[in-house]
Amino acid sequence: MIITTTPSIEGKNILEYKGVVFGEVISGVNFIKDFAAGLSNFFGGRSNTYEGELIEAREKAMKEMENRAIQIGANAVVGVDIDYEVLGADNGMLMVTASGTAVYYE
């Protein structure tokens, strides 16, 4: 399946717009990850702990969006946008939303 941020697929003819599809993931961050990330912040450098969590959440949201597109008969998703939001009383949860337009092309 083609998944792209562009509004069209170069060299392809979109025959049908199936509708908007979403993939959402909410991921909690626990104390051990917070502690490891805090050490990284204290000593400088990147937080591999949070980066890994972010990558995993994004990939899951993209896969969920793709699966929803397949369910409605699409073979591509165009105009994809990915949004990130921190949630929870202590900002302890990360929400990743992937959205785009499911299409059928030839």
From Swiss-Prot:
Top-level lineage group: Bacteria
InterPro entries linked: UPF0145_dom_sf, UPF0145_YbjQ-like
Gene3D superfamilies in UniProt: Hypothetical protein apc22750. Chain B (3.30.110.70)
Similarity remark: Belongs to the UPF0145 family.
HAMAP family linked: UPF0145
NCBIfam families from the UniProt entry: PRK01119.1
Protein's name according to its UniProt entry: UPF0145 protein CLL_A2504
